[in-house]
């Protein structure tokens, strides 16, 4: 069997607009380092920004679009079978490519498997213990021919926000956030409000009953945000231990389940099993 190329797409802040590195870095390095010599891993650089967060200042949406183009180029350059792995925003990049394959806009006959760590568009029910779904809502369709493995922690709101989480409203409002392109951000925000296209549109109304529901939603959102924040917080000399914190960045450092393996180790094992028992079958636009 020919060597499998693993293309890794990192999360927000793990790459930058002029990133031409080929060696895998960031959290996903713990996946690729655990693979055997049947695999050759390559980093796919892109802006990896969320507005003012990380270099470049592009909006999440614009950053993802650049990532999609670069990932497709990398898939076309791969000499044989390909597997894709993504973390956080990198999952969104991969999901967009999968959507193009599902729609018939892109052929990818060499794509054999996909692994997604903390997918912001994670569907409900794909990970045991996760009762919610990705904070960014439903992603693009996934072709039936491509096996996908999701890696998620139940307390990571990026991939497992509650169904009516207030954090979804923040995600909706900031998808196009960019101080470099304020006009685009404002225009997209106006369209969102004008058409009431929020994920929570059907769950928000003005009534005393809604107010009681909103109290629960506020408590839930607070817990979700604590899970996202670091495990240790400091402000003006005051240090606080946040026992719930760090869930989004712990996939390489903490056991994910009863096996004692980290999420990255679990994904590496799955990729190796796919390569052993399901040998990959070229990418054409």
Task: Locate predicted features.
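Extreme N-terminal starter segment of soluble prokaryotic enzymes
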Residues: 1-6
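Surface cap/lid and interfacial helix-loop subdomains adjacent to catalytic sites
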Residues: 8-54, 58, 62-79, 99-285
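Gly/Ala-rich beta-loop-alpha elbow adjacent to hydrolase catalytic centers
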Residues: 84-95
């Amino acid at each position: 069997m020919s060597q499998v190329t693993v293309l890794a797409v990192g999360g927000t802040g793990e790459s930058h607009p002029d990133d031409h590195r080929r060696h895998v870095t960031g959290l996903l390095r713990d996946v690729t380092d655990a693979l055997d010599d049947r695999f050759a891993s390559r980093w796919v650089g892109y802006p990896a920004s969320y507005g003012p967060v990380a270099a470049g200042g592009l909006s999440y949406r614009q950053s993802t679009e650049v990532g999609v183009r670069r990932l497709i180029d990398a898939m076309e350059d791969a000499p044989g079978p390909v597997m894709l792995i993504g973390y956080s925003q990198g999952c969104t990049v991969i999901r967009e490519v999968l959507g193009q394959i599902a729609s018939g806009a892109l052929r990818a006959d060499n794509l054999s498997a996909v692994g997604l760590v903390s997918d912001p568009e994670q569907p409900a029910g794909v990970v045991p213990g996760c009762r919610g779904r990705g904070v960014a809502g439903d992603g693009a369709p996934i072709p039936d021919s491509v096996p996908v493995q999701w890696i998620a922690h139940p307390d990571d709101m990026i991939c497992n926000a509650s169904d009516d989480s207030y954090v979804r409203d923040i995600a909706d409002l900031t998808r196009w956030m960019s101080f470099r392109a304020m006009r685009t951000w404002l225009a997209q925000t106006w369209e969102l409000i004008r058409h009431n296209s929020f994920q929570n549109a059907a769950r928000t109304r003005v009534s005393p009953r809604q107010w009681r529901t909103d109290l629960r939603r506020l408590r839930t959102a607070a817990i979700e945000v604590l899970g996202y924040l670091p495990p240790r917080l400091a402000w003006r000399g005051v240090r606080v231990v946040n026992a719930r914190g760090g869930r989004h960045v712990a996939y390489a450092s903490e056991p994910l389940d009863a096996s004692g393996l980290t999420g990255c180790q679990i994904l590496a094992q799955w990729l190796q099993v796919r390569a052993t028992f399901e040998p990959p079958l070229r990418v054409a636009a």
